[in-house]
């Protein structure tokens, strides 16, 4: 009942392009879908860890467990995530020992998962992990220190990976990193930076810039 008036229509112009919007987060602690009138049409009585609800293939999604937490120098991170359907049925449970934060995405429909994770070596939110979809095994962990070196590694949360996406045709990972003001592309097989979109004064004359096609933004 407390969610009945959670979404309020303040202004409406024309018919919405989307029948339903699925959301979860701070003020909406349970995954829920609402229509263009702001009416809740679907809700799951499972409260995930605050980073959200990640749709994957076959009308399923990944959610992070909020009770199984790993202490970090920043905030506790979940170490467990579930593959669920919209009826709340759990198909798989995955354990990521160094913790999960911010984003999870499929590499291919039904394939392995890319997870924003942590090095736990005095730093957090600085790694990308690949999780085997069938076995749950951690197939690979890429520490962003390998990509950017240590020039900016001057605080606990030096990268702060926010989002991930994967291009299966090119074997490339796209990422956004808040604390180094960058969107970038990495060759996932070779662990090489392909390009960056970032602030010019931050990245010019850096060693890796010679092997990356860089696009700079004028902060003005």
Residue ranges and their predicted role:
Residues 1-220:
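Histidine-/acidic-rich catalytic cores in large beta-rich domains
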């Amino acid at each position: 009942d407390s969610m009945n008036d959670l979404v309020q229509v303040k202004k409406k112009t024309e018919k919405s392009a989307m029948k339903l919007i699925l959301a979860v987060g701070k003020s909406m602690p349970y995954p829920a879908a609402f229509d263009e009138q702001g009416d809740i049409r679907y809700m799951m009585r499972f409260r995930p860890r605050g980073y959200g609800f990640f749709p994957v293939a076959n009308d399923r999604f990944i959610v992070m467990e909020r009770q199984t937490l790993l202490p970090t120098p920043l905030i506790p991170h979940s170490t467990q995530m579930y593959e669920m359907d919209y009826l709340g049925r759990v198909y798989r449970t995955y354990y990521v020992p160094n913790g999960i934060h911010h984003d999870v995405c499929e590499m291919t429909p039904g394939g392995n998962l890319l997870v924003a994770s942590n090095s736990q070596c005095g730093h957090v939110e600085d790694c990308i992990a690949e999780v085997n979809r069938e076995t749950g095994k951690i197939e690979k962990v890429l520490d962003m220190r390998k990509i950017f070196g240590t020039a900016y590694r001057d605080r606990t949360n030096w990268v702060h990976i926010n989002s991930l996406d994967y291009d299966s045709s090119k074997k490339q990972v796209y990422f956004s990193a808040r604390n180094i003001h960058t969107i970038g592309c990495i060759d996932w097989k070779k662990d090489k930076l392909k390009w960056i979109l970032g602030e010019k004064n931050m990245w010019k004359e850096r060693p890796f810039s010679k092997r990356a096609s860089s696009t700079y933004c004028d902060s003005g």
